[in-house]
Every structure is written in C-alpha cells, then in structure tokens.
C-alpha cells in the first residue's frame, strides 16, 4: 500500500472512531469506539484457535476444489449472421456517377495512418468548418485540410468567444428537437408512460422459457446479474462483484447443497494463446475459474429434497432462498446485492454448516466486535484470510467447531445471520469489517438529475440486520465509480481492495449511499454531425453539400419497403434507422427537402407497418416475464432474430426504431400523435425509468451499477451475462436522448445524456483499452477492444466470426453523432495504428464488404481528410457500405468531423492530389 493510501485509511479509521455525526453515515458513537479499542487490547487468551483434526491421512490430502475453466463460447441465443442486413446495393446504382465529376477513372491515394499530430485538433478550437452562402447550386468544390484559417464553425449555440463571427445561414434551420434545452435539476427517472401496451400487441402466457423458480408477479429484469439463480439448472454463478455465488445443488467436490462463495485472484486466471497478428501479441482471451469452493454457507438439513427459489428480484438485488424441502419453514435466505461487502446468509431454525473445498488451515474465535456478534478468522490453504461474523437472533455464543479440514459446524436450531468476507488488508481491513458487521444491504435504488451539462446520480441501499441505525454499510465500488465520486463519497473510501472478475479492482466504501458526478455531458449532440471541439455542425460547406446531393439519389432509389420489412426486428430497425438518417441528411444537411420527400413518405409508411404490428413476425406482450418480444422465437427456435424472444439484445433492436422515430418526429411533428405510444412502449421494455411500472421492469438492459448494458437475456450461461457491441449500447442511450428531445420528455432526454456520460467512462475503463488501461490484464490490453465481455471472462472474438474487422468493428457501428464522445480520439488512434494502418496486419484498404465503410467512417474521428478521400473517391464501390448505413450519411459525418477545412476548387484539388487534368 502506498503512503497516501495508508494515510487515507488511517484518517478514515480515526474519523470512524471520533466523529459524532458523519456526513453520509449513521451515528456510530462511542459503542464502536469502545468495541474497536476492546478488540485491540483483548488478551490473547480471549481468542481460541482451532485446527483440523490431525492424522497421517489428512496430511496427504490436497484441496478438493479444483479450478474449472470453461473456455467454450456458448452460442445459445446468438446468430452467426453478420450484424447488418445483406442487400445487393449495386442494383440501385446507375453508372456509379463520380461525386467529384472528374473525367476518367482516377484512383484516390490510400489514406495514410493518422499520426499524433491529429490530436492537436482536440484542443485547438480555432480550426473550424467553412460556412458558405452557396447552398442551392454549389460549384465543383471539395473540402481539403489546411492550417488554421480563422473561419467560423456553425454552432448549435452561439459561442461566447470574442472575435467570432456568426456563420452565414443556409437552407432550412435545424429541426427544433436538435437544439439543446437548458435543464436545472431535471429528474432523470420520471415515468415514460403508465398505461398498458397498445391493444394490437396481443398478450401471450406461453413463453418458451418458463418461470419456475421466481416467487412473485412483478415484472422481471431478465438481463440482470442474478439470472443464474433461476435459469436452467440454477447452478451457474451470480457475480455480485467482487464475490461470486453459486448453488452447489449436491455437486462439486463436497456434494454440498449450500451456497458457494468464491473470489478469484489474478494468479488463477487462464489465458488463451497469443495473437501474433497484433502488435504486442496479446492473449486472445482470459477466463476466471469456476467451481472454486472457498466457502459454502450450508446447513445439515439441506439435501436431495432441497429447493431454491428467488424472491423480490429488482434492479440491484434479489433474494435467493434455499429450503430444506418444499413448504418447509427451515430455510436460508441470501440477500444478493451488487457490490455487497459481505455475503450474508439469514438462517431460520437450521444447523449451520460452513464448508470449504480449499480446506480450512485454522479457524480463530476472535471475540465480539459488538455485543451479540461473534467473530471468527478463517485461514484457508490457499493462503487467503476470510472473516466470519455470526449474529444469533437470541444473542448466545454459537460456538462454531472445526470438525475437519472441510467442515465448520454450528449449533442446532440456529436463527440469525452468518456473514463472510475476504480480507486482503490485514488489521486495518479487519477493523472496517468489524465496524460494519451485523448489517447488510437488501435492496438498492438509484436517483439522478441533470443541471446544465453536469449529471449527478446516487446509488443507495436499504439495509437490515442488528443495530441498523448505528452501523454503517460497507459496499464495493468499481473503478468507474471511484473515478466519479463526489468529495463526500471519496472521503469514505477504505484501503480494502478486491479484484473483480472482469473489471479490475473493487474498492470498499463506507456508507449507505454514493453520489457520483458526470461532467461535460454532450447535451448539445443532436442529429447533425458532432465533434468534441465544435459541437453540433448543422451547416456543412457547399462542397460537402454538393457531395451529399450527388450521392443521395442513388441511395434514395433503394426499396425502402422491402429493406425494412424483414423477418428480424434487429435488421428491420437498422434499415429504418438508415433511411431516417438518410432523409435527415438530405433534408437538413444537404438543404434539399424536395429530394427526400418521396423517400420520407415511404419511410413513414414502412414504420407504420410495425406500429400496426403487421410485420413478418409481429410483437407480442409476454405476460410471463413481462415485456414485448418478437414472436419469431415461439416456433421452437429461440435463436431466431438473435434471441429477441428470450430478451436478447432488446436495447440494440429497439434502439434503432427509437432513433428512427426521433428523426421522423422531428421532421414531421404531426406524426407523433399516432406513433408516440408505440415508440414509448419500446423504451419502457428495453430501458424503463421507474421500478413501479406493472407492465415492464426497471432498466432491463442498462446496468446502473456496472455502467453499461448486458445483452444476454433468458439463456443459461456459466460465464454470466455478456455484451458484444459497446457502440450499439451507446446508440440506445443516444436514441432515448433524441426521442426524449423530440417528444418533449425532458426526463428521458436527460437520462440519455447521463447514460452517455456513464458509458463514456465505463467503456474507457473496461472495453475500449488504451495502452495505459489499468483494469484489464496487461497481456490482453493490446487487443484494444475486449471483444465479448462476460461477467466471468473476456474473449477477443465475436459470435459471428473472428476476423479482426468484425471484432473491432462491432464496437464501432453504427457511426452516429455521439460516436466521437464515446470513442475517444487517443483510443481510436491507437487502435487504427495497431490494426488497420497500411503497415498493420489487417489494412483497412484491403478489408472487403461493408466492414470497409465502417472502418473508414470510424477513421473520421481522428483523420477526416483520409476518410473524406475514401468516401468521395471516384467510382466508389457501394459494396463497401453495409446494409445498415449509407454513403450519404458517411459523407456528412466525415465533413462534420472536418473542422479547420477550407474550400478549394475541384480543379485545384485534382492538381494537388496528382489526379491529372489541365490547370
């Protein structure tokens, strides 16, 4: 521990002992002080050390709990199809007219890899996009980069910088919903809607996945961390971080029927083979072992007839209840809460049995931190130290006895709580655990608000146990939490750190709530291209507008009806989003409303097909789990539509619909009246804002503790939940932000802004790895993206293939206005140079198909010149544009990133690029 950490720990301990009323903490008073002093001065005779019975046979034993590494990729619920629909794009392109109107076939030089110099634009706001007054009929001009020219960037809001000149306005003004609205203390968790689903969404009670183990009728958050408690065999782990829990159910080395508690240290990780194609040769995956029986909280009454059920499943918690038999009052209740400091078991009239497959080395009866609480120090054969606190309901000493290397027995008829915690911090850590023993969290809540561009949210917990008013909780925070704590919360950090499975080290924090702050939120992001330096760019240069209007007719010729009415909500949503973005680009950025009029009308009709629920696989309201699902999976194949019927990927699928609706409604506000209810239904299903909605659970996909969404729904998994596409996760947050703005729902808009802020932080910490990433293993970071991040492992791959452009690209698409915010420039630069530069193993110039367009659109975030040259090149090959994107939008997107560019004639550009032609 460094000197600063030691000082903070000492200061916090002193504060706990001396303060009368602590901000954010319950009154601890002299009772805790006296207890800690007594514990420190108790004579050694007050402690009793128990050793396992010795025998020559025992000396030969080796730990029975062996680590198991399940390397295979579970494909259930995941399609091997590409993440965008496949269309013959060439069929709608007549002659592939050249955007630059140049003569003959000319080749654009291969874009060069960006260098460090591109980073200078991030802090130099003197480079801007040139505004022009010629919008209707621009000359043959095109953007080229120059030195800072003193031109002015069109801004969504006027800048206060002295000396700037207002840009010349061209064409139609930005749509109303594209202008940021000042907010002051806006609650981000107000209801989206309260009524039932639309009448044409029929209810079904025959969901293919039966709810057999959850007691209660409230909506169930299908994608939460505790799904292993109720799905399938009920034996897969639940990852509360830093601990993992799993019902033994008669399995494992000890054949126990209790709850396994484990914690994995970094030396126990297993690594995949190195990838020699990537600089640094990073390993392809890392995985935590399962089946480690560090401790098992059980009882002698548990056996073959025992059952486990789940009660009160909520956003941050659930209760796992193991009964000796169905209908029995003898039971152990485990409040399972994200970040809990101890694993707590609440016993009712049972004989406790604490087991270990790692083997007990010794158990020390270590006195009482407070009256009625009995403490044991547990030393295991893997050199780890755990603490056990027993709080009998009657206050009597339980007198646990170590009967073997694997069994620690308690008294018959025990009612009360037993808590266990791993202590890596020696005496100081032990004092923190002592101080919070006897209480435990039973549920979590979140609240939040937005003021200006600063979001604040609070995670708080309801607690139970002994002396709850005078005893503070101890909870574990993830790295992204610690980085965003306000000063009061930061002051309650301890020196206890435990490794999580896939998110670095967690930190124990004292108190019942944390307040976290996200500053500099991208509140001005709208539908137009956006950059971290210039904000929203509503007006492009004449050259960019010219390119857009030249490209648009080709793509507007596509059959919108056919491309949007598919047998997949995912593909259909992507197509609707694609055409909505195309219409917006032509209408607002190309300043040509008439050109997109027919396509806009067709788009609205195509969207209406889904609102009327007449698509190939209509939606149904699932009354079992309570949500809106595709009926495609009711035919016996839950893998249909990427597992939508079983709640896979709802934030991906529905996010595209929501984003498309936001654009349509902004361009035609009269459209909202007939469609708002249906779109809000999708928001409530995938990202509901309240916990008391009788029709949908709170925040199905987004995990407000982990700081990102989980894509896996009702599929049993030994590695827990997972997510493959961070960019589609951020797309959902962007979509609800823009839909909220379009319909005037300030709470939804603010929530989307705060989610984007949290995602920007969590992705930087866990998924999009820069060279100095502190949370992922050092031998994995050079992969730059995690690939699929599970709760128990990280695998640099995808469910649909292992091509490098797939693995990296699924974290890029869709490239939308928010992408520059969530994909930091330095990360993009490092990834490009390592993966896709001309000298790398997979040069973007040699990638085939739609992934090529994805890569070059992503390149615009750091090298817009090279990206522009790619998309504006003569005889552009439309096979490079995937079925969920358009060249037209990419041109606008790149131009929006191209601040600091000036206008030059086409002929001058041709001469500079050496493409030939007369001067």
Name these PLM-found stretches:
Residues 722:
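Substrate-binding surface in catalytic domains of secreted glycosidases
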